[in-house]
């Protein structure tokens, strides 16, 4: 334990943990996927224009964000709100337990919708709009700042040595950017995890007129991280394989192979376009690019000839089409993306990587680690914070590209034709989604 130079964290973003002065959690955490604050979203829109809000925060008004969640707590659990000393995100809560310090840093702060992205400070205007007391917000630090040191009590509980520096770290999406080498202008990455996103490092925020994308603060000083995150990317595939692929699970157990290996074969047996089948991947509502908490998932184009192989492929294509909207936003702003590193569990699917290359019409790169990019980003942030590493360029020593998928020109006409149909299908069903939501309250 004496060899530990620093401790740091990557954690899920857009959450809300209410703690009292003793650091005790007052209720269960509200996580990024919690969309209950829809009434608060409407209240905010009555108090500030969507455009002003977007340019202040880099984000849309949405129940996904931590500030709206705390607003919900105030409106629905006033006693908990009154007893809340600070609102924290999950990694900040662990930092509190290790150091006794109530802090956050710019990346997680930018997931609250209470941070002025340009000034990197809590916005008095937004706090007033949401009716949140400024003193309930934690101290703001840089990602590379030392929040404190491991206390004697924490050291005893965790088997650590007291006095180890604890560096703030960052939100998972931003740590992933560092872990995939997106530490300089114009480098892009995508994560195919439960939620899935595309991010690119730039010096200035990218503001989309339709507000389909948003911008995080970056761990690396002088940069920001324009991003589009869908709620249920890899999660859509996980849902499908769990609920509709029980045969493959049993067969895989008998043959000693993964069900995902069997499904890879099925995807390969279905042609691009999935035999005219579309999948809308909105199983838990949607953030970017739709920003519709009432959106639902759907298969469109089912017919007697449809086979499971088509359905599996349609799920992967649907996620790619949805993230493709984010790509189109960035390209429409003049951002050139020729290569993209893809991480997350979904990146283990060679078929999916090829679909991404074909839909985006860029090279898709698979690195030497898929699940550890966020941890790598946090570790490098810690090293820079305590001087073990001179700067973030050290990622080049760890990150290696193992495989590259190039676009298949034979498949692109199909995807170019289907992408607008995918968009048309979503917009045609928005009214249906609204009506169905009445049955799921």
Where are these regions (language model features)?
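Active-site core segments that coordinate phosphate-bearing ligands/cofactors
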Residues: 38, 45-58, 64, 68-103, ...
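Active-site phosphate-binding/coordination module
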Residues: 1-67
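Divalent-metal (Mg2+/Mn2+/Ca2+)-assisted nucleotide/phosphate chemistry catalytic cores
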Residues: 134
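Flexible loop residues that form catalytic
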Residues: 12, 145, 345
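Local beta-strand N-terminus motif with an aromatic residue
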Residues: 3-4, 137, 337
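Short linear loop/turn motifs
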Residues: 138-146, 254-259
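Short, glycine/charge-rich flexible loops or terminal/linker lids adjacent to PRPP-binding catalytic cores
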Residues: 34, 148-152
